[in-house]
A protein has these predicted regions:
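Catalytic phosphate/metal-binding cores of nucleic-acid and nucleotide-processing enzymes, i.e., regions
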Residues: 1-106
Length: 106
């Protein structure tokens, strides 16, 4: 792990819908940001950690949501290093590094 200010720099990967904004189930233009969560993401970025955003937007429809999502994130003031589209659509994710967004220490 790299060091930032004497601390380990980590790579954080955040989902978008239902994590840093409301889940609108495909009506992404209506999503509303969770300001306190975005502030936390930005603090991690400012502390030297790598912030990646990972979304399933367009996975099932084939619609390219990159430009709209980038514009939306900029409007919300989200700081990040990489936006990754193509997250598989699933009802349940089982992952050894996953943390439920409702349980995360925002």
């Amino acid at each position: 792990m790299a060091q930032a200010g004497g601390q380990d720099r980590l790579v954080y990967c955040f989902d978008i819908d239902g994590t840093i904004c409301t889940n609108t189930y495909g009506d992404y233009h209506q999503a509303q940001p969770f300001a306190e969560r975005i502030a936390h993401v930005n603090a991690l970025f400012d502390d030297g950690h790598t912030v990646k955003l990972f979304t399933a937007r367009g996975t099932t429809t084939g619609i390219d949501w990159r430009d709209a999502t980038t514009t939306q994130l900029a409007g919300w003031g989200v700081k990040y290093h990489e936006l990754i589209l193509g997250k598989p659509h699933a009802d349940v994710f089982i992952d050894d590094k996953a943390i439920d967004s409702e349980q995360y220490a925002w």
